[in-house]
Amino acid sequence: EEREKIGKKPFEYKESGQVVGFDVDLAREIAKELGAELKIEDMSFDGLLPALEGGRIDLAVAGMSVTTEREKNALFSEPYYQATQRVIVPEDSKIFNKSGLIGKKIGVQLGTTGDILASEIAGAKVVQFPAVPNVLQELASDRVDAVILDDAPATQYITAFTGLKILGSPIGNESYAIAMKKSNHALKEKVDQTINRMKEDGRMDALLKKYFGETR
């Protein structure tokens, strides 16, 4: 069974009422290799790891970065995507880099790496939202000073808003991987084998080109 949060282009989002995206296609390939039935349901990002621990889901394929804290509660597959964190501000903002975020009001998606990074900035007031479009809407409405988001969703969603820009320098590098229940080593082995096969036979590159126009 597979559940994903909805609203993180190009990884998972709704189009004509259907859940689509890079992670959805990746989950389909994995299910096909495992001979399993794929079930995709909407789930908030911060609820994914508790759902794994509780046995309500088997895999979390949701643009999730591997962190030391998350590894305490879940097993992670081989990485399938290299991401960075980006700062987005209004075009007329006086914030030019990470140090400019000190003491500012920062919007983030709840439970993400951006949420963690923002909480480490001195004096910052962190405002959490359930999905990327919500975060950018708050910025466009001048209710936060800046937002921190993963690079791919930031690039995809910012086009729907006027007057916003992504600052030039990334503020962190990380790997996306599939999360599984901490004790499920047999499943991890199968998922790793599938990811490695996809990298070797060109299927992973094909997915990257489909959603990003390039390989990574």
Regions found by a protein language model. Name each.
Residues 48-64, 71-84, 166-167:
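Short beta-strand-centered segments that line the small-molecule binding cleft or hinge
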Residues 30, 52-53, 101, 139-140, ...:
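Hydrophobic residues within well-ordered alpha-helices
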Residues 47, 64-72, 117, 140, ...:
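A ligand-binding cleft/hinge motif common to bilobed small-molecule-binding domains
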Residues 81-89, 151, 155-196, 212-216:
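Periplasmic-binding protein-like
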Residues 1-63:
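Extracytoplasmic small-molecule ligand-binding "clamshell" domains
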Residues 39-50, 93, 110-113, 127-141, ...:
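Short helix-initiation/N-cap motifs at beta->coil->alpha
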Residues 113-130, 162-170, 195-216:
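Ligand-binding clefts/hinges and TM-proximal coupling segments of bilobed small-molecule sensing domains
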Residues 89-106:
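Flexible hinge/capping segments at coil-to-helix
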